[in-house]
Amino acid sequence: MTDTEHRPTSRVVVITGAASGIGLATSRRFATGGDTVVMLDIDSDRLVVEAAALTSTSYTVDLCNAESIAATFTAIETDVGCVDVLVNNAGIGVAADLLSSTWLDWQRTFDVNVHSMFHTCRAVLASMLERGGGIIVNTASVAGLVGIRDRAAYCTSKAAVIGFTRSLTADYAHRGIRANAVCPGTVATEWIGKILATADDPVAKRLSMEQRQLDGQMGSPEEVAAAIWFLASPDGRFANGSSMVIDGGWTAM
């Protein structure tokens, strides 16, 4: 069977954190698959460039601001159409254990990683349910499954994403909603590059991050994007409420 035969009919796909990393790779994957991609990010300059390259629609949005999210999704429905697939991908992390974390660090991490999903999902769910269903894919992390040193807020927020995803399935699967999460291991994104650049010993830090995976390699944004694409495709129909681990074997032992 050809790749074309596996492609779903063109849909409106909204992706947050779409200007770089996993979000950008996911935008490219869905655009290649023939979908109408709507890219959201707070980095307006980068977003405009990347969206133009894909001939995609883009909106600058502050995911820490409920009013910004609501206005953006109202504009999407007016300008593009009803959302068929929502990919909640945007995320941030702070390098701190609990005692060295500030409340602002903790709150902002949850605002971007978790609370934004409350607002984005509420913005699309009513329309999805009226039309008989829809697809939501949330980017969690293996950090939501295992503890990582100096990532207290990040680990906790990603565990919350997994729980939130399961609750969506429990509440709405019988009405046609498919909600799943992806849990990547260490992925070679710009964010990881910044962590390495500020490390006391970048070479040792890179080695330790690579060795988390049993194959000794980081994943690529494109590999995670392929998993997100699968979960949103007809081939992923039977997956619902799942947390797909893509971690090079990190959590196998």
Q: What does each of the following model-derived ranges do?
A:
Residues 33-47:
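Conserved glycine-rich Rossmann-like NAD(P)H-binding loop of the short-chain dehydrogenase/reductase
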Residues 184-194, 198:
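Short, flexible catalytic-loop segment of classical short-chain dehydrogenase/reductase
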Residues 141:
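Residue(s) in the substrate-gating loop at a strand-loop-helix junction
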Residues 97-98, 105-110, 209:
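Substrate-binding pocket helix/loop in short-chain dehydrogenase/reductase
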Residues 118, 217-246, 251:
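C-terminal substrate-recognition "lid" of short-chain dehydrogenase/reductases
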Residues 173, 178, 239-241:
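Short, small/polar-rich loop/turn modules that mediate ligand/substrate recognition or access, typified
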Residues 121, 157, 165:
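Active-site helix of classical SDR
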